[in-house]
Amino acid sequence: LAASDYVIASHKVLIKLSELAIGIGPFLIEQLIRRKIGVSALSSLAYNPKKWKSSDWCLENGLINDVVDNEKKLNLTLNEFTGEVINYQLESLTMLKKVLWSDKKIDNVILENAEISARLLIMPKTQKILNKIK
């Protein structure tokens, strides 16, 4: 969701970041989530790895842009949205995407965070937790 430009979702959507519960953290996706919802909402997700957040929470915090009641409305809303977007100037859409994703530091931080995740993944305590999940 955090890597999407625009999200239309069902009211049934539930999300959580469970990484902390398995001995690592959401380091690989942290920058994308922070960019989308900010530090406070990211902290709420990351420090509560067993707690599901509702579609209302996602909407209030900017993770999704529109919530619909049922699958029929979801399909209708998606068709309407894509029907509009497809008629926009391609160059304008391309430049908009470029501007929205212009934060160059994200790539570097994601690489650094990948190293953190790798170190944590090989720790005995993390391995023990992961083996229990298997």
List each model region and its residues.
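C-terminal alpha-helix plus adjacent terminal tail
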Residues: 49-56, 72, 76, 80-134
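Crotonase-fold acyl-CoA enzyme core
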Residues: 2-89
